[in-house]
Amino acid sequence: MEHFAAIDVSLELSSVCVVDGTGKIVSEAKVASEPEALVKYFRESGLAYTRIGLEAGPMSQWLHAGLSTAGFEVVLLETRHVKAALGAMTMKTDRNDARGMAQMIRMGWFRPVHAKAILTQEIRALLVARKQLQARLNDLELCLRGILRGFGLKLGDVGKGRFERRVRELVAGQATLESLAEPMLRARAALRGEYAALHREVLRIVRNDAVCRRLMTVPGVGAIVAVTFKAAVDDPGRFKHSRDVGAHFGLTPKRHQSGEVDRSGHISKTGDAQVRTVLFEAAHVMLLRVQRFSALKAWALRVARTRGLKRAKVALARKLAVVLHRLWADGTEFRWSREAAASA
């Protein structure tokens, strides 16, 4: 008989529920949230598992890799679908969540999430760490600006290189302000150094990656955009059509249709928010900074004239997702005009 298992993952102990092909609960347990412990539990049960599932989350990729390596058929469940399916339960517990997910897996009522390769996960972790240091650096600078502004001291529009010198000029001769500015400037210098180190590592990865270099032939797409997009997609073959990529990253409008009502709303904003951000930034650069014209930019400018600049940037970001995927899948580079594309 077929058996299906669900794992509701927690930091220390995970709830496991096993059901048979009829939906009857065969076993339930609390198991340590370690790949070795879960593999041991499933092997010692003596059952043949058709599918084991767990909700996508911070530890899920790690557990998925361990169980898959042990030979089990493992799927990651899309978080929004799990939440919607289990939302009707009046009692939310880890045990009930595992039971509900086990039935979802048995019936096939779920959307699987792509499990990324280990190398891709490492690059994603590097990008997250870089982004966090960048955010903390910006927070520190804004905090220092705010403190000084309270005393009528305005830094004004200064670049990163002149920031520290300008602060010292403003607080000179004011003992209290000097005493609080000094440790904050030291912390800023340390953050800048560590951020620069991570940024250099990202650039090194991009230089040695043929796919990233190909994606960077698109105007407006720099190293960070290219590597962020590549790490998020991981495998271009998982999208049957390039046009699906924009929807995957939440860049297509939501739609509500019921009876005579049929309306489109704002973009869905599902999927990876960081990818949406870098694609929007790339669209901004193409529209406002890249001087050379292309068929893609001309199209976006026509949208801007009729729908406004912000909508044009969103539409261009969606187009960029499609173009980047197509270049990756085809192994081609960006063509600036339709004529060049036709002759290729």
Over which residues does each language-model region extend?
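Phosphate-backbone recognition surface of nucleic-acid-processing proteins
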Residues: 214-217, 223-224, 228-309, 343-344
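Low-complexity, acidic/Ser/Thr- and charged residue-rich accessory regions of DNA metabolism proteins
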Residues: 260, 297-344
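Acidic beta-strand-to-loop metal/phosphate-binding motif
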Residues: 49-57, 101
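Glycine-rich, often acidic, oxyanion-interacting loops/wings at catalytic, nucleic-acid
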Residues: 127-214, 338
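Short, basic/hydrophobic alpha-helical segments
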Residues: 35-51
